[in-house]
Amino acid sequence: MKNPNAEKNPAGIVVFLVIFGSLVLFPLVVTVAGSFMTEQAILLNYSSRITTFDLAAGLTEKFIKILLIPDPVSLEQYAEVLINQPSFLVLLFNSLKITLPVTFGALAAGILTAYGFTLWKWKYKERIFLVYIVVMLMPLQAVLVPNYIIAAIFGIEKSYLAIILPGIFSPFGVFLARQSMKAIPDAYFEAAKIDGAGNWYILFYILVPQLKSTIAAICMLTFIEYWNVVEQAVIFLDDYRLEPLSIYLSRLADGKTALIFAASCVYMFLPVWFLLSGQRDLEKGIELSGVK
């Protein structure tokens, strides 16, 4: 006799995924729709169930509908963000000044370090790699104070370098690249060494072409992480002119709602586009690394 509990229920799975996906996408839909609404339309339509208490009237409830289709459509807030507020673009470039060096630096450091862990034979390499894993699993807040102390010793605690250097030498890229390199058969390296190939030739002409998906995964995950940097910027950057865009958005909390929606859409456009355009490489890169 078959166990009915063991049989799969595709309809139930589909319903669950639809509900879960809707809950995940709803804030994004609200943000995008709100970015094309006027401030008056947002104040009129966007709200939640509000319960208030008055001594004379008692409990009162107010319901305001949530409108997800802009009516009328307005681009005024985008013009306000991109044209009338030059500081927004300055802070956007500040985010790029942090994100791009960390992304490319972490990629280069991760590939080179992973090469040494994978192909070279030296004592205690597995123990040292274990230290990498332990550091990778530590929460960011646990290493902020040591990072600040080290940055203060070198006199860079108030500059981008205090954020960029720890990001470049993050163990995550090393871990991901090494796991992918271990999946490549040793026959490739042995044949190359027999033909007289050196380390740089093996790295750039044998390893890198087979690690394209892993390289894309490292770049995407690092870019998104440091595009959304908050804690490091708050601690290290005391000059508002150096702040990234992620800090600017938190200051908009008391501003116009339509302006917040528009700024949020501009802010999330680049990482969302980056992620969607490289989704296949991201999935394949994580699959090759064996990360579950």
Task: Write out the residue ranges for each language-model feature.
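A structural signal for multi-pass alpha-helical bundles of membrane permease subunits
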Residues: K2-N9, I13-K292
